A protein has these predicted regions:
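C-terminal beta-sandwich/jelly-roll accessory domains of carbohydrate-active enzymes
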Residues: 141-168
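Loop/helix patches that line or flank the sugar-binding groove of alpha-linked glycan CAZymes
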Residues: 1-135, 141-146
Length: 168
């Protein structure tokens, strides 16, 4: 699911977002600019009804939801992702399985977290280290590929969401 873009401040329920909207107005922003600013940080993004399927209210309720359903619910929903091996849903299933896998659980759950590539734009990367294992986690937040010089050769890719990943 993606963050919802509220079209009006009247669609917002979060008191903190409402307060920030008022602060933005008091600072001289137009109502449109203030709404755009709070849309990026509103906690209501995580509180919208879960998008189960493409039916009314995304299959969440036959009643009236407390917040509006994201407009993209007919395309982005659990039903549309269940059978797609490249979907976010399937990626998270693999991620949860990795966390439960006895070969990695100790490191994933309890390993030390050591940041790396902190100066690389739009990359979040860190090591998870336990006594006998080190995992390197890299997230690229750009829309295009990035090149990183890795500190050592990758022995094994444990989890990846890209069809092609170059490690040379």
């Amino acid at each position: 699911m993606e963050n919802v873009e509220f079209q009006s401040i009247d669609e917002v329920d979060d008191i903190s977002t409402l307060d920030e909207y008022q602060v933005a107005l008091d600072a001289g922003l137009t109502p449109d600019a203030a709404l755009k600013a709070v849309n990026r940080v509103s906690r209501d993004n995580a509180r919208t009804p879960f998008q189960w399927d493409a039916s009314a209210n995304a299959g969440f309720t036959t009643g009236t939801p407390w917040l509006k359903v994201n407009r993209n619910y007919t395309k982005i929903n659990l039903e549309s992702q269940k059978d797609d091996p490249d979907s976010v849903y399937q990626y998270y299933r693999r991620l949860l399985a990795l966390r439960k896998d006895p070969a990695y659980a100790e490191t994933v759950v309890y390993g030390d977290l050591l940041p790396v590539f902190e100066d690389q734009d739009r990359v979040m990367a860190y090591y998870r280290k336990s006594a006998d294992q080190t995992l390197l986690v890299i997230g690229n937040y750009k829309t295009q590929p990035q090149a990183l010089t890795l500190p050592s050769k990758i022995k094994h890719i444990v989890l990846n969401n890209l069809p092609q990943l170059k490690t040379d």
